[in-house]
A protein has these predicted regions:
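Conserved beta-strand hairpin/beta-sheet module of binuclear metal-dependent hydrolase folds
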Residues: 1-51, 156-167
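Well-ordered beta-strand scaffold positions
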Residues: 10, 27, 88, 133, ...
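Hydrophobic "anchor" residues on beta-strands that sit immediately upstream
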Residues: 29, 58, 82, 164, ...
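Short catalytic-loop micro-motif centered on adjacent basic/acidic residues
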Residues: 30-33, 57-60, 146
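Metallo-beta-lactamase
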Residues: 36-38, 134, 141-234
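C-terminal regulatory/interaction regions
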Residues: 236-280
Length: 280
């Protein structure tokens, strides 16, 4: 595990979820998306210790535990760290049991709770809710940008080095080619956010999930691939609904026609995205 420099004071640490690190002049740091709880946060902290970096702030781009789950472990290690998120996604971070209810579409069950719930997620508290716009931390300015779609409260962080951390607005090309029926809450907002990203001035983009840092030029190609994936499923679902179908039959067709991997958890994620498409 390494601290990889993107530009200036902006770094990231690769992982299943990439973690952004912005280092201030006093060698304290802002962490963007600490990732899942477990062994990885301990390794991240070891890397930071080796570089004499003390974490002072955490910003979570959205309320999914693969991005915010390690907050408590960072809080235990760095006692005075300030944990932040959007106001909307604060609800899900502080009440992780709501996510399984949302995914199931009603009262959840023990099986789903056991898949999604982790004891290390208990009692995460958001110290400060943040809004879109200029945002000052430790005498330096950041841009907080709303990118709704994946969740209602998704945000991105743009550093003064012109590096943007977009959470799950985009995923890496290597992942998108395998899993193109993405987990989305609001299709129209996702389209709006993808178009919005095209007009933002940045030099480098760090994905929540993906192996490479993306240049501004390459981001256009990746944005179009995401838009095309959306169009693909919108077209398929419209075609399938020429004749009335139940939600279950429609979902079965989508899974089978696209050879989507399917287990209990993925089934409910696909169903949630399908409902979002139908709403759109």
């Amino acid at each position: 595990m390494n601290l990889t420099k993107v530009k200036g004071n902006t770094f990231f640490i690769k992982g299943g979820t990439n973690t952004g690190i912005y280092v201030f002049e006093d060698n304290t740091a802002l962490v963007i998306d600490p990732g899942l709880c477990g062994s990885r946060p301990r390794r991240v902290n070891k890397v930071l210790d080796e570089n004499n970096i003390q974490v002072r702030y955490i910003i979570n781009t959205h309320g999914h535990d693969d991005h915010y789950g390690a907050c408590n472990q960072f809080k235990e290690y760095y006692k005075d760290v300030c944990i932040m998120s959007s106001e909307y996604d604060k609800l899900y971070i502080e009440n992780p049991e709501l996510f399984s209810k949302y995914i199931v579409g009603g009262k959840s069950n023990v099986f789903m709770d056991n898949i999604l719930k982790n004891k290390m997620l208990d009692d995460i508290k958001i110290d400060k809710s943040i809004e879109a716009g200029k945002f000052e931390l430790n005498n330096e300015m950041f841009d907080i940008i709303e990118f709704q779609g994946h969740t209602p409260g998704s945000i991105a962080v743009l550093t003064k080095d012109n590096v943007i951390f977009v959470g799950d607005l985009l995923i890496g090309d290597e992942i998108l080619s395998k899993y193109d029926f993405l987990f989305l809450y609001d299709i129209q907002e996702q389209i709006n956010s993808l178009e919005k990203l095209k007009n933002i001035d940045f030099e480098y983009l760090v994905l929540g999930h993906g192996k490479q840092v993306i240049s501004k030029e390459d981001s256009y190609k990746l944005i179009e691939k995401h838009l095309n994936a959306l169009k693909k499923y919108l077209y398929q679902i419209r075609e399938l609904l020429v004749e009335p179908k139940s939600l279950e039959i429609l979902l079965k067709n989508i899974i089978n026609n696209n050879n989507l991997s399917n287990n209990y958890k993925e089934y409910h994620f696909f169903k949630s995205s399908l409902v979002s498409v139908i709403s759109y």
